[in-house]
């Protein structure tokens, strides 16, 4: 293991990020944190997300406290990897990017047309910054790190996970390929609103293309997001 064993996995919504967190949590050498900047994001933006008050009560709303914990707090006994699932849009401009330097960064991406097709069922009129691809491109430009495309991950999990572990300089563990169903103590308090399918899962579901075409009204938004996605996609591991 390199000196830094703290992994920050950056993604937008609807990218199988929680399933990937499950894969890491199923390793005996890893502890996970679920979206530690979420309360900060909600407190600063004033957005009315499901369970907003619960989220804000469950975490620090000071990004300095959050990142000090993520970069400096001791890992539990017997654990050598700290893995944090981060939403890219939670990283607001006021957060000092230098505070993220001790972390080992990685990225999970999804074709914006597929992402929008799923996300629009929850929020009918999303905006560019809701999807996080612009912010993710900025994080990638600053810190680099391996890139995983969610379609590749679902289509053939083991080789993609092996390549990801290799890129992060940690050993692959077959425990990442499946996990027991149900909730986890590590799940954020927002889990009842978002995690039903993950709670029912025991592994990565096979890739399936969207059943319906992207609504025409969302095509311009997908086109705006596409260059950010393509920027990261060219570096994806396989």
Predicted features and spans:
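PAPS-dependent sulfotransferase catalytic core
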Residues: 1-76
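A basic- and aromatic-enriched beta-loop-alpha substructure that forms the phosphate/nucleotide-
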Residues: 52-109
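PAPS-dependent sulfotransferases, especially Golgi type II membrane carbohydrate sulfotransferases
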Residues: 1-7, 174-238
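Soluble or luminal CAZymes and related metallo-dependent hydrolases
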Residues: 58-66, 88, 128-135, 156, ...
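PAPS-dependent sulfotransferase catalytic domain
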Residues: 84-175, 192-195, 200
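A structural motif corresponding to the C-terminal end of an alpha-helix
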Residues: 77, 139-145, 228-231
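A generic structural signal for alpha->beta connector loops
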Residues: 27-30, 80, 102, 144
């Amino acid at each position: 293991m390199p000196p830094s064993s703290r992994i920050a996995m950056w993604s937008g919504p609807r990218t199988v990020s929680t399933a990937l967190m499950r894969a890491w949590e199923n390793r005996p050498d890893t502890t996970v944190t679920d979206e530690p900047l979420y309360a900060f994001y909600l407190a600063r933006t004033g957005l009315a997300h499901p369970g907003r008050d619960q989220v804000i009560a469950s975490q620090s709303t000071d990004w300095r406290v959050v990142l000090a914990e993520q970069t400096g707090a001791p890992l539990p006994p017997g654990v050598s990897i700290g893995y944090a699932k981060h939403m890219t849009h939670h990283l607001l401009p006021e957060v000092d990017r230098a505070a993220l330097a001790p972390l080992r960064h990685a990225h999970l991406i999804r074709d914006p047309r597929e992402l929008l097709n799923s996300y629009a069922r929850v929020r009918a009129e999303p905006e560019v910054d809701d999807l996080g691809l612009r912010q993710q491109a900025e994080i990638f430009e600053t810190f680099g790190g391996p890139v995983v495309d969610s379609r590749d991950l679902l289509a053939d999990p083991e080789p993609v996970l092996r390549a990801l572990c290799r890129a992060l300089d940690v050993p692959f563990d077959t425990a990442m390929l499946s996990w027991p169903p149900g909730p986890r103590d590590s799940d954020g308090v927002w889990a009842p609103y978002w995690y039903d399918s993950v709670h029912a899962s025991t592994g990565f579901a096979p890739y399936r293309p969207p059943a319906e075409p992207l609504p025409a009204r969302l095509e311009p938004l997908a086109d705006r997001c596409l260059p950010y996605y393509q920027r990261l996609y060219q570096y994806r591991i396989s």
